[in-house]
């Protein structure tokens, strides 16, 4: 009767470590050895003894019942049966007891020689090919050359069978009988045994020293990299010494996982469904047993070797079947799922079972609208509620003494007897439920509601909660979850109740904004109508106005005068006479008086502002009531107004025909120009598109005027549009204007869609012709296809964002940093995209901000910038404010509250423990789907805005030019003008009186300038204009043109137009890279003045030998044709930025300020040389196919692109530094979202970018433990440098016994040691100062950054699971469970919000008790003081 020990793992652990398992450990955790491949007896269905399901090893199949049936029942618990050897215990031990298989020969673990980087290969310095040939028994490897060393045979040499036998023949007789430890013995083996011996003999310290030396001193870069790679593996093993030994990468004992985790289920018909693992284990056991027998009967070496190879292969496929070239397949030709596969991917252990579990106490059903619900309520069907709250009802039934046992109570509930409804009402009070709608893209996808029981089978949802859930009632389903514990109920009520979540965490705007019918109703009753009944009446107060309306004396839209309560300048509520309408009075009955009197027409936009104001003035609770009032009023009025529309409400403007006619005439004109040869085909196309775009937008404007003046603007269609209830200008334009230009379907992989130049002239009311309809279908279908594809992308983006930022939590109040970001208005040319007010609101200022004119302190350093302060700053002349930002936060873990600023969901400073990283990821990911879903609304309509090709003065101002280079010309009208020939020219408009810069514009190269530097211009004056359709190259000198390298059909082709017979020279990319087309300008005498390169695709507009004047165009390069706007800008661009990828055609960027000289042409690249004033020279190669943006002698700044294309983030980081690249990424991503009209606060992007910039790469390791080129965390880097700061490195140990050369010691220890040596007159220790490491900041894409986090659990559950675990095991990594994912995987509370680790230690007690403890403490202290 032996007893087994219980080893339960505690669940309150705080760290998880991973490492290689030693054979001893596997044995210790095993409950017995599996000897037979049998699983269960097919007749009795009982497990076979010693087989894969053996009860003796893994435990009984039935609770408390042994195999032979001698012991049954719980009273024999813990007894081991003497007949069958099964311990009598619960059957659930079969989920946790492991077994093992003792292998006859060791095998190599496939993870460590098949996956890259090849660990065993790097340790031994063997290439993968050679390693394979050893492991799979093709070659012998020399482990110890012994006496054969003089014959030139060295360790690690590979021998074929013949060579090996030859050597054996030449060995001295007794050599093979020597001990293995004898250095003279010749040893060579094959297979994993050989590798085991080699690994066991490694001296890691010596190897590390040698590799470090090689990495530091080797001249060849390749060998250096090789050494560094090997060094990394060696260092991992040295760092995890004691936990990991290299030889443990060779498996001698295979663990067998518990049988319940690889079940065998009998199906009907005598067949079995089994886990693939059983097959894989079975093959291992069969081969292992066969090998045992072959060795016993002393089979020939060849047979044994084959069997050993097969054993190695079967263990390989058990561990990782997908790694192998020939995966083991089932009969159906499906590869078997191995142990690694069960961890990988969406269906793997991590993502399927640990991060997302199905839970009980849940239900789901279709949702319907519940307009009479309050903001915090939802309707739950009776039957669903009875099932969800079942245990609660049973408890109450027993408490009330209605039934005695649980079983009978269950029956009553199942029969749905009337008594339970009363109890259910009682139970549901104060017991909220959580509603969730998939996909849960942000935290508002799960909210808590107070349930109400309703008849029917559908869940009722409050209409205002729809926006947050992104729900509609066309058949959406939602899931209900029940929080059980008191803590959960409390959190649901306090934090998650729908009426508390009115603000959107992404941007702080209200998210519960009434939509559709509600908006329409409110808009309708707040609209004024001239000449309505009772116009001009005056009332003494709202009551009288309402009485008059109810009596039918005054119309709801009539403009009347009423004395109402409103706010004066100081914000006090006073009675004022206002011109208003009865409708507005009705609305203001609901609005809280603190907000004042709302005397405007209410649209969706203004409603959002009103709700914001109500929240600020009255708090969340009153806002929820206000929203309910607004909802009821809106529905009621939309119903009373009868706001439907008919065909007559869709008005087609009379002017349409004339406009279209004019369009046709203009197009004819363009075509005749083309036929006469004045313009190229490309220009013709661009101009035609332009004409129709103009016609369309003009028609739209006329249409809007027409429809808005119809019936005083009470046209139903117009009201729906204007109130923001439904529809857009685009849609109305297509209903009653014209559909306009359409995009052409493009071939797969071709560049963006061209636009069909014949527009659709009809609208939907007139109906489309067959051809028009056909053209339309393409857009509509493309829209649907895009949507389906892009939704998946958006989801994946969200997942990567969460993974990179889930461990960013507010961990402290103030990190004490002195750095910040400088914030200004964000401008694009002239228009302000984001005001300073928006950008600094709710942030913390770094310095005191003082009003420059009055000198008053607006905000102290370290204080939050509130609405009032931000407004004051915006109104003052202050241009920029330095604010705290997460990008500059210096917290060790997470970020601090001051650097984050305000929590947008509450409008207060963020609290400790807020999971800001996840919020940021959700805020960016959630609109991602909108980025995608916005395409097809345009129906593929090509919105190509007419090109803007001039600079016009917007105000009276003085002009200042920078970097301006021009040549004088006479333009086509005969006016004198200048042509700009510099690339960096800028013009500043300066206010004549104040000297403030009003705006700055780039003056493009090749534009015609009509003003002089310093000139004062009137408003509306044309400053400059340029050709919108072509980029040009202009001569700066007058002279004769001579072409070089311009050869027909080599570097140019001639396009002639059939219609016009006009011929054009177009430069093409030549196969012969030595021929470079260029144009020289010569003087009369034939001296060279200037040379211009002719770029590929340029149209040459002059002849060879022609005379040109300065300022004349020699080449036109047609700009890319107007492409149809599609999302592809959207999501892929965001991904590209967050992944820090280099754009497809990166620009070549100058790294220094300096002067440009053109070099020679090398291999199809033009060399550009930049020389700085200090004499530094940088050379760049630009492919000839690219247009070069600089000319000879131009002066460029660092960061100026030398060729066309986009600048890469890596270049920005290298040249302009981290701050510049951070701002660049944040602003670029913001641009994509802004374009879609999505508002997201900057701080969310900052958090993601902070996570992308966490790592540095080591340049010089100095005396630290880092390696060159190693990527480490900034924090780790700083800590390591701090650790060796001020310490000394021993150069010569002298006569010291304690210190060795190369050791790092503190100054104090050194002093003690040297004084001791001095006393004994011995040679002292010589030292030098320790050298710190140096590093370079790097930018990582979010995927890389997520895989590089300190937590291996988080990384493994993200992507590349096997690789991550593989690395982690070798490094012996320890996961401190600091992020969210790790804790969810372990089943712990997340370390954020109420689960913040500080709160664990808090003891909650009563105040009196606390006071009593304090009093006692005082007396104790006094007593001590007396002594």
UniProtKB/Swiss-Prot annotation:
Positions contributing to Zn(2+) 2 binding: 815, 889, 896, 899
The keyword Plastid appears for this protein: no
Biological-process GO terms, alphabetical: DNA-templated transcription
SUPFAM superfamilies the record matches: beta and beta-prime subunits of DNA dependent RNA-polymerase
Cofactor: how bound: Binds 1 Mg(2+) ion per subunit.
One Pfam entry name: RNA_pol_Rpb1_1
The reaction(s) this protein catalyses: RNA(n) + a ribonucleoside 5'-triphosphate = RNA(n+1) + diphosphate
InterPro entries: DNA-dir_RpoC_beta_prime (IPR045867), DNA-dir_RpoC_beta_prime_bact (IPR012754), RNA_pol_asu (IPR000722), RNA_pol_N (IPR006592), RNA_pol_Rpb1_1 (IPR007080), RNA_pol_Rpb1_3 (IPR007066), RNA_pol_Rpb1_3_sf (IPR042102), RNA_pol_Rpb1_4 (IPR007083)
MF (Gene Ontology): DNA binding; DNA-directed RNA polymerase activity; magnesium ion binding; zinc ion binding
Gene Ontology CC terms, in alphabetical order: DNA-directed RNA polymerase complex
EC number: 2.7.7.6
Binding site for Zn(2+) 1: 66, 68, 81, 84
Cofactor: Mg(2+); Zn(2+)
Annotated binding of Mg(2+), by residue: 472, 474, 476
Family note: Belongs to the RNA polymerase beta' chain family.
PANTHER family given in the database record: DNA-DIRECTED RNA POLYMERASE (PTHR19376), DNA-DIRECTED RNA POLYMERASE SUBUNIT BETA (PTHR19376:SF54)
HAMAP family documented for this protein: RNApol_bact_RpoC
Protein's UniProt name: DNA-directed RNA polymerase subunit beta'
Source organism: Bacteroides fragilis (strain YCH46)
Source lineage: Bacteria, Pseudomonadati, Bacteroidota, Bacteroidia, Bacteroidales
Primary gene name: rpoC
